[in-house]
Amino acid sequence: MTGFTVRGFNHTGFVVTDLDRAIGFFRDLLGFEVLSRAPRDPALMGRMTRLPQPELEIVHLQGPGHRIELLHYATNGIRNADQPRVYDDGAAHVALDVDDMDAAVAASAAHGLELVGEVVTIDAGPNRGRKVVYLQSAYGLTIELIGPPPAG
């Protein structure tokens, strides 16, 4: 026994370089609702992150069954030239079930996301038979789209 119980997921967070574009992706393309957008206290966030006096703005968005947190550090001064690749240690993504893979890929491209590889059909595991693809944005998001289960 661990002495505590996980009661559910609270959110998935992404650090992004362009908060407005990331909001547009989740709100305008995916239909998520913006719950809050506000700067955070630099002293408090510095204690949490060990980054001295970070200038940070956080947005929370609600989607179907899950909340997304977008974080923008305006003054960290240590931006990575490249975001993690989908196969790098520590890389993260959120996977979204979509009802039309072709339409989702096209709409995502219109919002500046690019295919990492190609759309493939999974051959094993819980998503067997479903089409999947990774997408990345220039502002720090990696999204996996998962198409509907095969008919029958």
Regions found by a protein language model. Give the residues of each.
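Short secondary-structure subsegments characteristic of cysteine-rich extracellular domains
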Residues: 83-87, 94-96
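Core segments of cupin and vicinal oxygen chelate
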Residues: 15-65, 103, 110, 123-128, ...
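Short, structured motif recognition centered on aromatic/hydrophobic residues
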Residues: 9, 16, 26, 61, ...
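Short, solvent-exposed beta-strand edge segments and adjacent coil->beta transition regions
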Residues: 7-11, 56, 89-93, 130
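Vicinal oxygen chelate
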Residues: 1-5, 14, 96-152
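Zn2+-dependent peptidoglycan hydrolase active-site motif and core
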Residues: 80
